């Protein structure tokens, strides 16, 4: 028997919680980070004996924010910010990141939090097979393919779309790019249709740039687009925090320029961002809370 409750973008199944990344990230950024990023807490977290106790306390507080009594939090539906994930892993929070698609009803990859590898989305789920369409799956990203009894038979009355999605050997083509390590852990790079090409043909994954940018000061969310041979980052600022700091339009623009410069020290030269443009409204999203990227590529 499965008992579940649905609230917003979280769902509880038995004693686990399923959530989209946006919900987790907002809780951590708004409720947790401000409490641990002062000088005193930073000092305590660098003292080995005390650090363990402090992290246990932080983990308890984060767990209580989700009700306290659960086996694990399963995160999926969109890319998970690496800064937030690294924090959750460092304090021992019981989470895992899964991967799936409606066409697979919906689970493709999953791993119990006890064996989960940070940065991955788990391994092929029970009865599923997953492979990377690449000559070197561990190092060269390729399309993620899935096969198993839960893969759909096809799209209703759309044979052409079905043939484009499921090949003659029964492999479902996800449209996502990723790698797989020797233990079968899958690491998603981004959507194949989102991939950009650098000036010399390098593959650029905008989701990876956005993940780093979203961890910088006053950035609520972002979309990286290509204009000619330049990469432009559209940023929706954290206006609440900016107001708390009493920052005006000019100061906010200065912060974003500083962010751009810092970002470019964190990424390869061929994927450097030339400009950050402030986007006043929140980006439109799908029901899974993924940004509708196609709406902003023409800006």
Predicted feature residues:
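Adenylate-forming
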Residues: 151, 185-214, 241-251, 268-273
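Conserved C-terminal "lid"/linker of ANL adenylate-forming enzymes
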Residues: 221, 229, 261-299
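Residue-level signal for inorganic ion chemistry
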Residues: 17-20, 77, 130, 184, ...
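Gly/Ser/Thr-rich phosphate-binding loop
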Residues: 16-18, 30-116, 129, 220
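Single conserved hydrophobic/aromatic residue that forms the stacking wall/gate
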Residues: 1-8, 13
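Conserved ATP-binding/catalytic segment of the ANL
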Residues: 131, 138-198, 215
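Short Gly/Pro-enriched turn/cap motifs at secondary-structure boundaries
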Residues: 119-124, 169
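C-terminal boundary motif of the adenylate-forming
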Residues: 177, 215-239, 264
């Amino acid at each position: 028997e499965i008992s579940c409750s649905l609230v917003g973008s979280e769902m509880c199944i038995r004693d686990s919680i399923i959530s989209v990344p946006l919900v987790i990230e907002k809780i951590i950024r708004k409720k947790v980070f401000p409490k641990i990023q002062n000088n005193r807490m930073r000092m305590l977290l660098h003292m080995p004996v005390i650090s363990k106790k402090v992290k246990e306390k932080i983990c308890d507080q984060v767990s209580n924010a989700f009700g306290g009594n659960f086996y694990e939090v399963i995160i999926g539906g969109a890319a998970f910010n690496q800064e937030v994930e690294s924090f959750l892993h460092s304090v021992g929070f019981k989470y895992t990141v899964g991967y799936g698609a409606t066409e697979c009803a919906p689970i493709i990859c999953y791993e119990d939090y006890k064996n989960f590898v940070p940065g991955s989305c788990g391994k092929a789920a029970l009865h599923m097979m997953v492979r990377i369409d690449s000559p070197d799956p561990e190092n060269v990203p390729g399309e993620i393919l899935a096969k198993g009894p839960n893969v759909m038979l096809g799209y209703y009355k759309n044979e052409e779309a079905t043939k484009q999605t499921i090949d003659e050997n029964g492999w479902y083509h996800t449209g996502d790019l990723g790698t797989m390590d020797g233990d079968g852990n899958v690491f998603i790079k981004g959507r194949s249709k989102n991939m950009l090409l650098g000036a010399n043909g390098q593959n650029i994954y905008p989701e990876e740039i956005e993940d780093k940018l979203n961890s910088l000061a006053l950035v609520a969310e972002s979309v990286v687009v290509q204009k000619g041979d330049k990469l432009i980052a559209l940023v929706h600022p954290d206006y609440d925090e900016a107001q708390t700091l009493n920052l005006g339009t000019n100061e906010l623009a200065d912060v974003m320029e500083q962010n751009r410069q810092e970002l470019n020290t964190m990424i390869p030269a061929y994927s450097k961002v030339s400009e950050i443009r402030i986007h006043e409204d929140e980006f439109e999203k799908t029901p899974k809370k993924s940004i509708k990227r196609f709406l902003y590529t023409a800006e």
